[in-house]
Curated annotation (Swiss-Prot):
Binds 2 [4Fe-4S] clusters. One cluster is coordinated with 3 cysteines and an exchangeable S-adenosyl-L-methionine. GO terms for molecular function: 4 iron, 4 sulfur cluster binding; aspartic acid methylthiotransferase activity; metal ion binding; protein methylthiotransferase activity. The lineage of its organism: Bacteria, Pseudomonadati, Pseudomonadota, Alphaproteobacteria, Hyphomicrobiales. GO terms for cellular component: cytosol. Residues 143-381 form the Radical SAM core domain. It is an enzyme of class 2 (transferase). PROSITE patterns: MTTASE_N, MTTASE_RADICAL, RADICAL_SAM, TRAM. This is Ribosomal protein uS12 methylthiotransferase RimO. InterPro entries: Elp3/MiaA/NifB-like_rSAM, Methylthiotransferase, Methylthiotransferase_CS, Methylthiotransferase_N, Methylthiotransferase_N_sf, NA-bd_OB-fold, Ribosomal_uS12_MeSTrfase_RimO, rSAM.
Amino acid sequence: MAHPVMTFDKPSSASPKISFVSLGCPKALVDSERIITRLRAEGYELTKSHRGADAVIVNTCGFLDSAKAESLAAIGEAAAENGKIIVTGCMGAEPESLQTAYPDLFAITGPQAYESVMEAVHAAIAPPDNPFTELVPPQGIKLTPRHYAYLKISEGCNNRCSFCIIPHLRGDLVSRPIGEILQEAEKLVSAGVKEILVVSQDTSAYGVDLKYAETLYGDRTLRSKFIDLARELGSLGVWVRLHYIYPYPHVDAVLDLMAEGKILPYLDIPFQHASRNVLRAMRRPGDQEKTLSRIEEWRKLCPDLTLRSTFIVGFPGETEDDFQILLDWLSEAKLDRVGAFKYEPVADAPANDLDLTPVAPEVQTRRYQRFMEHQQKISARRLREKIGKHVSVIIDEASPKAAIGRTKGDAPSIDGKVHITTHRPLRVGDIVKVKIEAADAYDLHGKAV
């Protein structure tokens, strides 16, 4: 998905101009924000025009072949209008394929290679002598609306799921120091951010590579550990939402913080499948009966918990029995928010070497449709249970007599919305109480109280 990149007032008519294209997930968006912050700190101007820019940066996604195709198309569009194209991001980890498609690229860097990107920019067009560093806010430049922001806590992943090439592209887990994360979070809160969305490739593994090292932060000693980080973020007085949670046993401990209202009662856990056979082939945890028991315990500890997950249908070797196990599991789990993907073979993924029978594309499509229809009914029932309740909603869009927002159970872009009628003006970023009056397949409807 392409993320719009804002433009800024010119610091000087002579300022060098950079056009920027940001593709991919929220983790890639954070990388784009860091690069753009550096550009602005050095006095570069951002422009929407490839043709009028001194160079173009394309931050690519390479997780799936469809994402690679989108990235290549974006590079092609830029190359048609500009001779200095700098490619970074996940596709940059495989420069040979990029050079084959576009041999005249100015520079290629890998993911999170911020210094290499800036070196390429300097080679393309030198920065001005008098940068306007005062134009850069303390929290850095964000590409999200002012009231929420993504906070990336680590890079890479130690898991080796057979369908995934993230470790190949971004390496093993590298956690940021806990003090550095908290400093960034505090700057975001000071800048008016009302919701922090915690992201990484494997959020619940935070600190494993650091061996949970202790750090002096202010007058406190903090451990670089998932639960400790969650507790500290939960003390900042804003909404804190956890994404990309691998279901390790220690995740259970975070439910206490949710029940206490410290962090949002929301878990984004990609379960991926429910059949033991398929999960084994995926190299994922395979005891979904135990997972059902954990979900039941989580909901006892935190009755307001929202569970979001993603699944892959049509994985090589998936039989009709395997798929039915998945549907039956969904009926028991009663997850609130669910997304699904049809399996795509990805170059260099271990799944390519499993010697399993591919699922025919037409079978994949039918199973995907059945999956979505099945889960839609479950999600709709879960939403109808909220009718008549008063819920907290953060406002994303506002007009004089109406607004659109999200509950604590809804992340931006991927989950549902609340359509609100109101007799008083609401502002973007407000957190208000709304009485839910109706629900449809994905969204809620209510009145501000």
